[in-house]
Amino acid sequence: MNFFKILSFFSLFVITCFAKLDLNSKTDADGVIQITGRLFHRIVNGKQDFTTVALFSADSSTMNCDVCRLIEPEFKALANSYKLKYGLDSGIRFTYADFGKNKNLFQDFSIESVPNFWIFKPKSIQAIHVDLSHGVTASHLAAIVEKHTGKIADIVYKQDQAKRVGAFLSYIIVGAALFFTRKIIVKIFTSRKVWAALTIITVITLSSGYMFTRIRFSPYSQRGEHGENLWLAGSQQFQFGAEVQVVSLLYTALTMSSIFLAIVAPKVEGAKRQTLFVIIWLAFLWIGYSFLVDIFKRKVSMYPFKLLI
């Protein structure tokens, strides 16, 4: 009789050990079990002697889920941190289910949105739903796991050695490039022409209303009452994105005209050619200002000035 009892206990011990080994073998390097429907029902069956932390998510590239993209590396860091501190026999199992591979499992739990972070306590199939609106960082998730299990682990993020080596090599290449081209770089950054061009571009960009539209999130254009496409807002208090582009183009044309008249015209050889050059760019300048003044008049009906238009 004692022999059969001993044999029964030994058989139970062997089965338990094999069950643990089987579960451990399905754990990846991060300490996460990539589950399918059948495997999850084997893990959470109401008889488990461990806590199951489950993340139900979806591939962010196919589902366009920004939160999924953020939480997945944090969940891996969470599982890896517990694995480093407690090993695989910590009494906590971290499982991950992807929607694309577990549609039936998602239907079984009536999951209609992702991600979902659930905790199943030992001997229970009732999930504890965790609200993710307060954050999805590994530290925040670890605090939740500690609350329900009493175990905590300091979060340790894995260092991607390939990225570190790549970054180091990039720094070396950039440093070498800067060293061998230092004379050219110095000439560029000490050139008056370069700084003049940068200054002109900055002034035109800011004075055309670019920052105004960026701060107010102005639309590019707008439909009028009769379905026409309006690119010019009839008010000084508002501006469309298309209007910024038109005004910037006008400012650029006027600036180039002024530069040609001030710098290039005196260097033109021959009195007749120089006179013709000046007349052409003066006409261009006059026409450009006419369009600019017309825009001012359209935005403010009481604007008193007018040129050609």
Curated annotation (Swiss-Prot):
Main location (coarse class): endoplasmic reticulum
UniProt keyword terms in alphabetical order: Disulfide bond, Endoplasmic reticulum, Membrane, Signal, Transmembrane, Transmembrane helix
Lineage, uppermost ranks: Eukaryota, Fungi, Dikarya, Ascomycota, Taphrinomycotina
Similarity-based family: Belongs to the OST3/OST6 family.
SUPFAM superfamilies: Thioredoxin-like (SSF52833)
Assembly description: Component of the oligosaccharyltransferase (OST) complex.
Disulfide links within the chain: C65-C68
Transmembrane segments: 165-185, 193-213, 246-266, 276-296
Function: Subunit of the oligosaccharyl transferase (OST) complex that catalyzes the initial transfer of a defined glycan (Glc(3)Man(9)GlcNAc(2) in eukaryotes) from the lipid carrier dolichol-pyrophosphate to an asparagine residue within an Asn-X-Ser/Thr consensus motif in nascent polypeptide chains, the first step in protein N-glycosylation. N-glycosylation occurs cotranslationally and the complex associates with the Sec61 complex at the channel-forming translocon complex that mediates protein translocation across the endoplasmic reticulum (ER). All subunits are required for a maximal enzyme activity.
Mode of membrane association: Multi-pass membrane protein
Keyword Transmembrane helix among UniProt keywords: yes
Record bears the keyword Endoplasmic reticulum: yes
Cellular component terms (Gene Ontology): endoplasmic reticulum; oligosaccharyltransferase complex
Residue intervals of the Thioredoxin domain: 29-150
Gene name for this UniProt entry: ost3
Pathway given in the UniProt record: Protein modification; protein glycosylation
Top-level lineage group: Eukaryota
GO biological process, one term: protein N-linked glycosylation via asparagine
Protein name, as recorded: Dolichyl-diphosphooligosaccharide--protein glycosyltransferase subunit 3
Signal sequence, start to end: 1-19
Location in the cell: Endoplasmic reticulum membrane
